[in-house]
Amino acid sequence: MASPTTFAKVSRFVSRMYGRLFSANPYPLYKFLRTRYPLLRTPIGFWIATRYADCVDVLRDKRFLAFDLRALDAFPPDDGLKSMREALQHAIVFRNPPDHTRLRRLMTTFFSPGVVDGLQPRIQHIADYLLDAVEARGSMDLIKDVAFPFPIDVLAEVMGADDADKPMFRDWMRTLGVPLDPVISANDPGVEVRQAIADVRRYFSDLAADRRMHPREDLISIMVAAEGRGDLQTEEELVFSAMFTLLAGHETTMNMIGNGMLALFRNPDALARLRSDPSPAAIESALDEFLRFDSPVQVTFRTASEDIELSGRTIPRGEHVVVFLGAANRDPLRFTDPDKLDITRPDNHHLSFAGGPHRCIGEVLAKVEGRIAFETILRRMPKLALADPNPKWRPAMSLRGLESLPLTF
């Protein structure tokens, strides 16, 4: 447990970094850091990397390991955070070789382009179903009505859940999404988080037991088969790999849809261009630009396994690097006119899916979800318009998304 002095330093640093003003527009601060302090050691002992080249080096260098969750001991005590840490230590994103290699090989099999292509009819059905529910109203909150439930319902089908269970999945994500940015949440959601984790564990344990007897073509069945081969070594790996797949695949896709749609409305030329050419290639190019321009995930973390030289500085063994993906994506040394939304941008190698050994496994699924969501919304709602020109952003440390996005059509 860290000392009260350390807790105070953390609280002061975080309150300055992650207030409402920062959440509304973090990019001026990113520019300042990139220009003046591109590799900065903070008062709480974390290094901040904001240049594209440095971020790529950290992500690709295998000496930088998955973030050591014990570093969270430096943050003020939070029962919800503690419960999440205990669960997520089993998730692939916080594992290192050989466990990471074993788990990634398993998960990559299911999220391959061929498998995801087969999911497209169901993903399209979910998008149409959600829009059917709001079409007669003439208005909607894109976040509440579409962007929030859409990826949850897709992932529930990926897992092999019944339609009747989807509302329960949505409730879990409302609860478990809170401690993903624990240092800025107003209250400690410990009781609710513990209960949600217990419910998730029970649900996926029961679903796995059913799939052992009655396998299907879903992710839980693949995990059960892997368990039989020894590729999954514990019940915790199965349960919490499923839980983290939900968490990682939900929040990021929700933010991609919300952030991207807001970017279109604030750049009417881009919106007009996409409406005139809604081809899959055009939408896919636009999606990459949405991801670069306003990344759903702003930061990721790595831990040095040994002393590592980075841009003339030494990152000591055991210290942590905060890789600011959102800052790297606006680096003028890598991107021409980085603060401009250009949905035809060539050579758009953004870092919103991170990179290296821990590059996002769900990238293919996320892009298919995004393409179907934008194509369907723009096709079915040609008069779509922004109802609130200044929607509120959720205050957050690592994720960037809107609280709501009211639209009329």
Where are these predicted regions, by residue range?
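Cytochrome P450
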Residues: 1-409
